[in-house]
Amino acid sequence: GTLWPLKSPEQRDCAFLRACDDCCRLAGAPQEQFVSGIERDLEAQFRYDKNPMMTWEQLRGLTRRGHIVGSHTMTHPNMAYVPDAELRTEFVESKRRLEEALKSRVDHFSYPCPALSPHWGDRTVDASAQADYRTAVTTNGGPVRRHHNPLCLRRVRPTKDVDGLRWNLECTFMGRAV
């Protein structure tokens, strides 16, 4: 491995960005090993919530109340860098597990928000179609038009206040990405 100097804020920023880039190119067990290695080498002690995820019963409650639950991968990788065999597993297995637990069809997929771009492409769009998704939302900002491919939809980011909403609307109507 590479030894990175960590004495200055700039050196730490550079090492962090490089680690993010390297981590985003991995998926599954190799990604987990990479992160575990960093935790070990830095003697980091990260705080984890005891219950950071929703339970199956909470998800079923949402669907009973009319919410749509979509898939988001098994291991949260950058899908553009996942090998073909693992790509299929990320799409299919996350969908299958949700459908089995919720006893309902899962038609929608949301790409993980990566630290490295791109995070989707023609290969991932094809794989999402083969996994039988009807829509997939990317992390690319901007409005969605009728003619856009439903398997690589843009999104308008939520805002905390009216000024943020106003900015999103102005960008949308001026044709800029949000």
Label every PLM stretch briefly.
Residues 1-65:
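Extended, charge-rich helix/loop segments that form flexible
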Residues 1-6, 64, 77, 81-178:
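C-terminal active-site subregion of NodB/CE4 polysaccharide deacetylases
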Residues 68-77:
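Histidine-centered catalytic micro-motifs
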